[in-house]
């Protein structure tokens, strides 16, 4: 009988407890995943007590307060603080989302924060996005048109053609959807995942691009595209309210149409 075991250093252990140093008006406990590969130790869950009466309304505000006032070694990405850049994507209360737009008041009980799942962790809440960006590069996410552009203007679109990009161009590549997808967990070495496939369709749907056939051929692969099993986690978790599953379905339909199906 085959017996499978996780490496001993993959077990998450209880970490440090940072208790309140003074009385708080609105005390709240924040549990944060901590891991530093350079230390060659197990990841831990550290606990911090903070006063929400002296903290901003979003989970990112709580993390910044912890880093500034309690533990400066806590590591996470952040930038815009308004749901535009995608830097602060992480798993909060069991759901992949952006810390900067996740209200603390929406979370009952302790605030539990982990890095995006099924990605190598650089440190603490920082995932390694290298493979994700390599996959993004593979779809050639730029306008491809062999015809010269008009000399005195941009390549124009009709209002109707421009509207076809709504729900696609807004993707901020935060990877919340891809890292919520079981198919991506299992086959991320070959399956492009919902974020990249939505981005691929964004260029396929662009009327200014004349490389549609080649783009579809590049995706016609048992793993790149067809590992999508319509689980729909991607659509449920997208912090921008987009529908990657719909975009993937449209790519599949276009490929079928090319084969006369």
Swiss-Prot record:
Cofactor-binding details, from the entry: Binds 1 [2Fe-2S] cluster. Binds 1 [3Fe-4S] cluster.
Residues binding a ubiquinone: 186
Binding site for [2Fe-2S] cluster: 80, 85, 100
Ranges for domain 4Fe-4S ferredoxin-type: 161-191
Cofactors, names only: [2Fe-2S] cluster; [3Fe-4S] cluster; [4Fe-4S] cluster
Reaction(s) the record says it catalyses: a quinone + succinate = fumarate + a quinol
Keyword Oxidoreductase appears in the UniProt entry: yes
Keywords per UniProt: 2Fe-2S, 3Fe-4S, 4Fe-4S, Electron transport, Iron, Iron-sulfur, Metal-binding, Oxidoreductase, Transport, Tricarboxylic acid cycle
Protein name per the record: Succinate dehydrogenase iron-sulfur subunit
Source species of the chain: Rickettsia typhi (strain ATCC VR-144 / Wilmington)
Gene assigned in the entry: sdhB
């Amino acid at each position: 009988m085959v017996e499978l075991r996780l490496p001993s250093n993959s077990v998450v252990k209880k970490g440090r407890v940072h208790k309140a140093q003074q009385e708080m008006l609105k005390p709240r406990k924040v549990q944060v995943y901590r891991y530093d590969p350079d230390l060659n130790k197990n990841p831990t869950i550290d606990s911090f007590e903070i006063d929400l009466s002296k903290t901003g309304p979003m989970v990112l505000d709580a993390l910044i307060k912890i880093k500034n006032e309690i533990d400066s070694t806590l590591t996470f990405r952040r930038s815009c603080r308004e749901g535009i850049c995608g830097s602060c994507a992480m798993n909060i209360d069991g759901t992949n989302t952006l810390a900067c737009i996740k209200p603390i008041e929406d979370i009952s009980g302790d605030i539990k924060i982990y890095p995006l799942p099924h990605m190598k962790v650089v440190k603490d809440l920082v995932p390694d996005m290298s493979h994700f960006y390599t996959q993004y590069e593979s779809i050639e996410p730029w306008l491809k048109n062999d015809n010269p552009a008009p000399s005195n203007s941009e390549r124009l679109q009709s209002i109707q053609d421009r509207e076809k990009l709504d729900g696609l161009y807004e993707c901020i590549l935060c990877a919340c959807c891809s890292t919520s997808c079981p198919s991506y967990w299992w086959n991320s070495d070959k399956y492009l995942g919902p974020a990249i496939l939505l981005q691929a369709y964004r260029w396929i749907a662009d009327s200014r691009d004349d490389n549609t056939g080649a783009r579809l051929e590049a995706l016609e692969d048992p793993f790149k595209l067809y590992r999508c099993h319509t689980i729909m986690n991607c659509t449920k978790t997208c912090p921008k309210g987009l529908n990657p599953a719909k975009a993937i379905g449209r790519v599949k339909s276009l490929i079928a149409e090319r084969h006369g199906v």
